[in-house]
């Protein structure tokens, strides 16, 4: 069974009419059909206004479809009686960790969610301990969140989601407010959760180098799913990406520029190590010369 499945997902929203005459209806999602399998690591790309965050909020049942259906582990998100089960199965980490942290001590914040759904006290603290260990924040259990760096706060937010024992986590631009070190801390945690804990990950991002870490990429444009494939398949379609207001990872752009200058490199390079190995091979072949 798919962890996430959408069928003809349509979402409309209303905004004030610019002429001041009531409201007008806009469409954010146009008939999305999507299936996400257990353990997948998917990155969702798209320019501002493409519908990425709107889709994310449907997965966590913060929004429900105008038309069509969203199922999370077989549960229809339009069924209010299933709301807490859905939000337990599919956790969400938002852009600003300060909006997700509600308590004055790290361990209390991580235990807040399980306490709210009635988890017994002895089980709560086991969940808190396990979650903090998984994100590398055990040493900060007694620390006030305001004393943490941005990356540390985001890892606490992730721990709070983990304490709910989700099978899937949606990261909605969760690194966009962080410095490079904080981004790397969070991304390292995300990779480990997917590889070691087999948690399904949906990473919404505008950083191409983050998207390259995923197993599968989805590209959205104007409320539609327009591309679906592996990073190698997607990042070799430079013109298609450009038309959607997107680029390739910096390392891919560098490899492409070198290829255009005559360096014999394969297409579809999107990892630094891969480029370094390819350049080393070229140098060995040419006796130390790059061409």
Across the structure, where does each feature detected by a protein language model lie?
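Conserved ABC transporter NBD signature motif
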Residues: 68-78, 86
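Conserved ABC ATPase "signature" region
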Residues: 122-140
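The feature captures the beta-strand-to-loop junction immediately N-terminal to the Walker
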Residues: 45-47
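Catalytic Walker B motif of ABC-type/P-loop ATPase nucleotide-binding domains
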Residues: 169-172
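Conserved ABC ATPase signature
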Residues: 144-148, 152
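Helix-to-loop junction immediately C-terminal to a conserved catalytic motif
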Residues: 60
């Amino acid at each position: 069974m798919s962890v996430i499945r959408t069928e003809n997902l349509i979402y409309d929203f209303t905004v004030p009419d610019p002429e001041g005459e009531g409201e007008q209806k806009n469409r954010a999602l146009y008939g999305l059909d999507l299936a996400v399998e257990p353990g997948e690591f998917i990155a969702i790309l798209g320019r501002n206004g493409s519908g990425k965050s709107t889709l994310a909020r449907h997965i966590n049942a913060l929004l429900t479809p105008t038309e069509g259906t969203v199922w999370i582990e077989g549960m229809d998100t339009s069924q209010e009686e299933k709301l807490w089960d859905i939000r337990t199965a599919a956790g969400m980490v938002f852009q600003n960790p300060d909006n997700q942290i509600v308590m004055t001590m790290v361990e209390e914040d991580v235990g807040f969610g399980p306490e709210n759904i009635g988890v017994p006290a002895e089980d709560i603290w086991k969940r808190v301990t396990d979650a903090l260990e998984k994100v590398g924040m055990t040493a900060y259990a007694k620390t006030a969140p305001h004393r943490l760096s941005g990356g540390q706060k985001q890892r606490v937010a992730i721990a709070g989601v983990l304490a709910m024992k989700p099978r899937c986590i949606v990261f909605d631009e969760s690194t966009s407010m962080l410095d490079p070190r904080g981004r790397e801390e969070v991304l390292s945690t995300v990779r480990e959760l997917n590889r070691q804990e087999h948690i399904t990950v949906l990473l919404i991002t505008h950083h191409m180098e983050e998207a390259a870490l995923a197993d599968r990429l989805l590209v959205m444009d104007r409320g539609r799913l327009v591309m679906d494939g592996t990073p190698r398949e997607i990042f070799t379609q430079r013109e298609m990406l450009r038309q959607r207001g997107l680029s390739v990872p910096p390392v891919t752009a560098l490899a492409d520029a070198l290829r255009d200058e005559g360096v014999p490199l394969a297409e579809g390079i999107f990892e630094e190590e891969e480029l370094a190995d390819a350049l080393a091979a070229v140098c060995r072949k040419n006796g130390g010369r790059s061409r």
